[in-house]
Amino acid sequence: MPDETLRKDLPEVDPSEIEDSRAAIADEHRSFLEKVMVRGGLADPYDARDITEVVFRVMRDLMTTQAADHVEGELHKQAYPTEEKELQKLEIAELWRDTNPLVGFLSRVRPPWQGPGIFKIDSDRFLFRVANEGGLPPTVDREQVVKAVFSATKEELSEERIQEIASWLPGHVRELWEQA
């Protein structure tokens, strides 16, 4: 009789909603994509991977090729330990590099998208691109997701790289970077 309720005076509790400290994984033991997924409120590591690639793409668009190469040089850790072949050997540095060969080539030969002009990336355009290119549903807070990627990324970088990236980010996005 598993469906029978014995004590009707107690509220019904969904066991999946109970946080058991024995089952919780300490944040320092989470992988890069798990951190992005949990902190950003994303459904799975594939969503975390996709949005991380977009945030990284917009960040690279703001930087010189040399600065982007410095960052990539520090991101050689496994992004998500799993048995799934698609994510199995994925390094954080691979998320930093653009997966589209043409875009990757163009980003290496063009100057940073800063300063006056129609291609300038300010904070609003940064967040707009993340939301649109990342395919974020309207229920997901784009700033929360960006901060999730930023905080997971900062944990992988030296203080010198963290400061270098901050110097390239526009106003409000720089504040998000510093808060992460």
Each model region followed by its residue ranges:
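General marker for long, soluble alpha-helical cores
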Residues: P2-A180
